[in-house]
Amino acid sequence: VISKWMNETLDWKGIYWNTRKLDGNFADQKNYVIEQCEGDYIFHIDADEYPHETLLEQLPQILKINDVDLVWIPRVNTVDGFTEQDVQKWGWRVTENGWVNYPDYQARIFRNREDIRWTRPLHEYIIGCKTYSHLPPQEELSLYHPKTIEKQEKQNMFYNKNFSKEMNVR
């Protein structure tokens, strides 16, 4: 998703593409990415997410206003093909727009410091941030996270097969 979006939307100046085989530990994967980064802040986007264009345009102002270690970003989750049964099974909250669990805040913009790292192999949690803020729950300041119900079911089966029940809880 992100590579297609980047090719269509962004000038590649200053953007580096790096790949690494996933070893089953998502925190290790994210910490590897941190080690590749330079600069004061890191804007971490998962491979199946993309930012609203306004969010990108306003990043310098967001960082100036929010002099914090971590900025939580609202995320628009869309799941094509879900049914009311899926909503009940997974305990989702669905908005009038069909967004799942909005604003589903994600830790995505954080200072590039050695003490800020990800922990937990699944449903990772960021540690080391002492100060934080949340962007308002507005679509133009959000990440998009589109998927199909088939992908959601496959993802849940992978998590259930490869991670303990305790690890599979946020």
Where are the predicted features?
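Acidic donor-binding segment of Leloir-type glycosyltransferases
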Residues: 1-23
